[in-house]
Amino acid sequence: MLMANRPHSFLPEVGLATIPSVFLFVTAVILWSLRRKREAALWAVSSAMAALTWFVCLGLSTSVGSSTSLSVWRPEDLFDSRLLLAFDSTGWQMAYAALTVYLSLALTQAARPGATTMGTRIMLPVYTGLSLAAMLAGNLLTVAITWAVLDLLTFIFLMSVTTDETAIPGIITRLAMDGFSVITVVGAAAANWSSGQTNTVFGEISTPLSAGLIATAGLIRLGMFPLHFSLPKLPRARRGLGTMIRLMPPAIVLAVLARQFEAGFPVELIPWLNLAGAVGAVIGGLRWALAEDPIQGRPFFVLAIAGTGLLAAGVDPTATGAILTNTGILILLVGAAFSMAEIHSPAHRLWPIAAAVIVVGAPFTPGGVLAGAFARGFTGAGTAWLALLGGVGLAAIGTGMIAGAVSPQSNWPIGESMVRVVYGLGIGLPVLAALGMGLQTPQATSLGGVVFFIGAGVAALFGRYAMHRLPYGYKELGRGVASRLDPDPLYRAAWRVYVSILRFVRTVAEPLEGEGGMLWMLVVVILVLLGIGSTAP
């Protein structure tokens, strides 16, 4: 199913890599043409098209190894390559996980009446289709373009749904950080070109500076360097498309890093990436375990899992590609499992609990890949501390997941039995897909990984028990201490400086408008004439 050991091939055979995205774009067109229909009809169409796309992607697993060139144009002075989608094992696994999340969101939409607008319903397949293209990006040119398009699309959506002016600085901060990462990717291409190498296909970029810039761009988008934890609170973007916007970007980054560093991180980058992984695992894990609202705490969940994945890759360089790929799968599937699981019946608690078991390293799951790497780290030279930090990160993530599973039960928002059944299928699908993908991954099962999983699981249970028994005042104190690590005050200060500069420029520019502009133009002309006269012989 996963074709984990199939070698990469970038031969331009057929356009298989574009098929899932094309299906999603067609879905958006169909939904737009049916925009005046009732919500039930729109839900049925979107769910049917999502299921069809999901099955098509599943069938494409036999074609792993092909690639698709999307253009004749190439910027030879910098990238010397065309737009390229690589349908390798990493890309297929990520695409399958992303489409599983998309299908789950489509199935559960009917259980959230009124929460999905027509614009959101149409944008969901468009955003997912562009995300698939970014996951399959085979070179730096494709990464730069797809990242920039996704950033712009996200910015437009967030600005359209926010009703709180205080949230705008956070949205612009997110756009600025992501834009800086795109510039860093362009810098990686420039460094590669200046060194005399023109090949920007991932896996074949050997320039140390270029590799370092690619890794740095990934860390920026993961929120590790510099730290930028979250988007502002957007009540209309908690679930649905909000889930996609928070889970897709880090998975895209991990797909790129897995493709570039499949054979291991360069020696020069290992200390830097280990430090970033430790920051993500510890800070992200602590903030996630202390999060009062799991939905608003998703950025810390992403930061913790991404940091833990980087630590695991540093422990076991021989499996870097598989580790980073499965880290992205965990972010998508486990993140979707708790993001969509509103507890309406006791049976619904099963899926968040199962997701917690997966994320702490259960065998035969993507989490087992990380647990196995950490188990090997305890026996390696100089890697025991990385394994220990990884165990702390997994335990903290599990603690936060258990807290979400025991959240209070709420009433059904809708009474139709079919909607309830489909909703149960939708929230359980990511967990079942994670189990199926883990069963096909050889690195997901090892004796050491099982032992590590038991230890991390016990630590997560103990952490949850301690959090439950801890007085509320102490929890608030812990959140207050942890929030001091939040760099948002610095970003707010930078925003105020930016606004002050704009206000100054506006004040200076106002006299140049209207009649004042004509007067100033006369003054400029007189000064020029005086200058010419003073230089005349």
Show where each model-derived region lies.
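Central hydrophobic cores of alpha-helical transmembrane segments in multi-pass inner-membrane proteins
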Residues: 16-34, 45-60, 76-80, 95-111, ...
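Short helix-boundary/re-entrant hairpin motifs in multi-pass inner-membrane proteins
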Residues: 76, 213-272, 292, 299, ...
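Transmembrane helix-loop-helix hairpins at membrane boundaries of multipass inner-membrane proteins
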Residues: 2-18, 27-115, 121-122, 473-476, ...
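Aromatic-capped, Gly/Pro-kinked transmembrane alpha-helices
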Residues: 441-447, 468-537
